[in-house]
């Protein structure tokens, strides 16, 4: 197997296959569940809006893919600074049956100099999660400044995040190698049990390999696993399957 094919295979096993569109329906989520059970093995998770968790759970059970985790989003996509609402949404997501919650850090508040609300919001949402995995989206493409990307990562980890994630996929700049370098460095300094999720903008096996390479350089080859590394993506899967010669070439897309 070539290095590119190895990267494609790994990326599928590390993927949160995502649909977070305004026009999502039960049928689209059912289709997503079927896609997540790929000819190259199952993706790590699917990521969907909370209201679709019950139909996703039912579908995954029906197709014998119970090992695929169900992730959802809260305080999404704008990262508002109302802690009470973020906590209510997170509790509701857990009640719906989410295995993982991706919450948006109040990044605009941080840009305005308020570090406290981000820390407190993540801490409160982690408490609301209990045993459910908490990923914190810092929206690195909007933060832009390396010092802010670093600070959002530090605050999230200090507040109890299980993962730090680059992006919502709803802004012009999503996952970049520069942001990955900063965020993974913070993980190496703070707590190597914390995971990393580049989301949006990873289009093919070659790009996936670049992100995996940064993680391995900073944290070691043994660090990368579904417990510590995920790709948030929708259009990436078809490209990876094409690399593995298991699907036709993907059509050009503007998607996540």
From Swiss-Prot:
GO biological process terms on file: 2-deoxyribose 1-phosphate catabolic process; carbohydrate catabolic process; deoxyribonucleotide catabolic process
Q: Which GO terms describe its cellular component?
A: cytoplasm
The record, for CDD domains, names:
DeoC (cd00959)
Q: What metabolic or biological pathway is this protein involved in?
A: Carbohydrate degradation; 2-deoxy-D-ribose 1-phosphate degradation; D-glyceraldehyde 3-phosphate and acetaldehyde from 2-deoxy-alpha-D-ribose 1-phosphate: step 2/2
Q: Name one GO molecular function term.
A: deoxyribose-phosphate aldolase activity
**Lyase as UniProt keyword:** yes
**General function of this protein:** Catalyzes a reversible aldol reaction between acetaldehyde and D-glyceraldehyde 3-phosphate to generate 2-deoxy-D-ribose 5-phosphate.
UniProt record similarity statement: Belongs to the DeoC/FbaB aldolase family. DeoC type 2 subfamily.
> What's the name of the protein?
Deoxyribose-phosphate aldolase
